[in-house]
């Protein structure tokens, strides 16, 4: 199927409306799992972005050494310290037992140090069994996990290097070739893929969408973590990984453009987080 570029009208449909009489928790509960001794900021970016995307509650699971800094970053995050400094099987099992009732979506991998890949499988399988919609990024993008997420309404968000590690194939340089490869692999593995790049390619194997919103300043570290948080926040309310990923890519790009307009080539990922309310407000709908 031919790929097509998304626009504002698509995003307006993909971002769910909110009931005027809704209560806390009914607009999405998100779990963010990430971080390490070196990369403490990644899950913070994702968590703040998820909150700014419009969900109600964000639970942020980080290594216990990172917990104080994560709590200090925002009083809005509910921080869950992991039992170990890296994701071990024991830490994964304990976290699975702490998952709050009614969790809608989870994003895993941003800056995450994984001691053993079987630990990732333990956590992912537990979440899938609870009907939690899952988005995987960065450290969680390993081939061993593909069998566990196939046909489970899951999203992966690799850049080109992570894409090769995950699928064993390098995406072509031309957009037509990239779109064709992403669509084929999404269909083959029963997942939704968001291949990040100057033009993002999003496919669930049936539909393939493109996003060209963004700015040169977005090469700064952390913008991919922001994208993961937005995707998880929307996925908590929209059960379609394709629509959630496409909307997130577009909105992330809009925030990057707005940040560059304000700060030139001197932005940070937190600038994108702070601009999310203004770029998302036009897509707000109340029922």
From Swiss-Prot:
A Pfam entry, by short name: Carb_kinase
GO molecular function: ADP-dependent NAD(P)H-hydrate dehydratase activity; ATP binding
EC number, UniProt record: 4.2.1.136
Cofactor: Mg(2+)
UniProt xrefs under CDD domains: YXKO-related
YjeF C-terminal domain mapped to chain residues: 7-283
EC top class named in words: lyase
Superkingdom classification of source: Archaea
Descriptive protein name: ADP-dependent (S)-NAD(P)H-hydrate dehydratase
Source organism of this protein record: Cenarchaeum symbiosum (strain A)
Lineage of origin: Archaea, Nitrososphaerota, Candidatus Cenarchaeales, Candidatus Cenarchaeaceae, Candidatus Cenarchaeum
Protein encoded by which gene: nnrD
